[in-house]
Regions:
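Accessory cap/linker subdomain of secreted extracellular hydrolases
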Residues: 80-227
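Primarily recognizes the serine-hydrolase "nucleophile elbow" in alpha/beta-hydrolase
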Residues: 46-105
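Alpha/beta-hydrolase active-site loop
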Residues: 21-42, 291
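Histidine-bearing beta->alpha loop at or near hydrolase active sites
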Residues: 267-282, 294
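Short beta-strand/loop motif that positions the catalytic acidic residue
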Residues: 232, 237-240, 244
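Short amphipathic alpha-helix adjacent to the substrate-entry channel of hydrolases
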Residues: 1-12
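Conserved alpha/beta-hydrolase "acid-adjacent" motif
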Residues: 245-251
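Catalytic active-site module of serine/aspartate enzymes centered on a nucleophile-bearing elbow/loop
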Residues: 285-303
């Protein structure tokens, strides 16, 4: 995409995360600093556009909401746009349900994981073998309102399950370090259910699933890391696969609701690809959305 933007006459400044893990606050700071660095070395741009994928899309969202006077438009792709808590709840509920139906298969639990866990040999392969050996619980995990794993076929659904479990295994200790070891996932009052499965199937789940209660300071960290306000004052286009295996597509609808409540619906345009994957959106679709964003900013007419 960098080459395509350059050929279209745009200068590009970009930043990676300076640390591993859920470094959303640092990502926001570093990316925002780019504009000042660019101005000091090259000159003040006539227009500035934000582009980001996945966690980077959340960075873009935060900057668009927080500094609308410094950016003209934003393209947020496959992003954590419903907020950090929404993503944590998705992953945490997936792990909690997996542990209920497949006890003892994986190390640790929702809020505990051994250091230096092997994501392939300790998470992915044991989970895959457990599911393939007993597929009966899979729909109860996949179709729960709290998870709704992406996929139209069993292989896609299993892939989404494994992605969530590996994501959890690699990220939970980082998250706990950021909350000083305090629990940030809360299912203490969650009633597990599904729009596709009778409630009776979830009676044992609701009676016996492991419960966790988040602490107020951990909730405060979530709120600061980043929860969207919906106060979107510049044009934004979102692009997301409908069956995203890692960051659920419904993040976009959660953000739409926040934008609607803030009275900023005119500034948000949602687009999707009816396919399975994560961020592999393709250059043509990406550039089309970017070009449409530029046209929107220039003309004031929403595509």
């Amino acid at each position: 995409m960098r080459e395509a933007l350059g050929q279209a006459g745009f200068a590009i400044a970009y930043s990676s995360f300076g640390e591993n893990g859920y470094a959303i606050t640092e990502g926001i700071q570093r990316t925002h600093q780019l504009r000042g660095i660019f101005t000091s070395r090259v000159g003040r741009p006539s227009r500035s556009f934000l582009i980001g994928h996945s966690l980077g899309a959340q960075v873009v969202q935060a900057l668009a909401e927080t500094y609308p006077g410094q950016y003209n438009g934003a393209l947020a792709m496959c992003g954590v746009l419903g907020g950090t808590k929404f993503q944590i709840d998705y992953v945490g509920n997936t792990r909690a349900l997996f542990d209920f139906f497949y006890p003892g298969v994986l190390p640790g639990n929702v809020m505990e994981m051994p250091e230096n866990v092997d994501p392939v040999n300790q998470i992915q392969l044991p989970a895959l073998n457990a599911v393939l050996s007993n597929q009966a619980p899979l729909p109860l995990i996949a179709f729960a309102n709290q998870t709704r794993l992406a996929g139209d076929t069993p292989p896609e659904i299993i892939t989404s399950l494994l992605n969530a479990l590996v994501y959890h295994a690699l990220g939970v200790n980082d998250l706990l370090a950021r909350t000083h070891g305090h629990i940030l996932f809360d299912n203490s009052k969650t009633f597990y259910s599904s729009a596709l499965v009778p409630d009776s199937y979830y009676v044992p789940v609701n009676q016996h699933i492991a419960r966790f209660t988040a602490t107020p300071d951990a909730f405060a960290w979530l709120a600061n890391s980043y929860e969207p306000t919906g106060d979107l004052q510049i044009p934004m286009i979102t692009l997301h696969k409908t069956r995203d295996r890692l960051v659920p597509f419904r993040h976009d609808s959660v953000y739409q609701d926040a934008v609607d409540k803030a009275g900023r619906s005119a500034n948000l345009l949602r687009r999707s690809q009816n396919s399975f994957g994560h961020c592999d959106l393709g250059l043509p679709a990406t550039m089309q959305s970017f070009n449409d964003l530029v046209g929107w900013v220039n003309s004031g007419v929403k595509p």
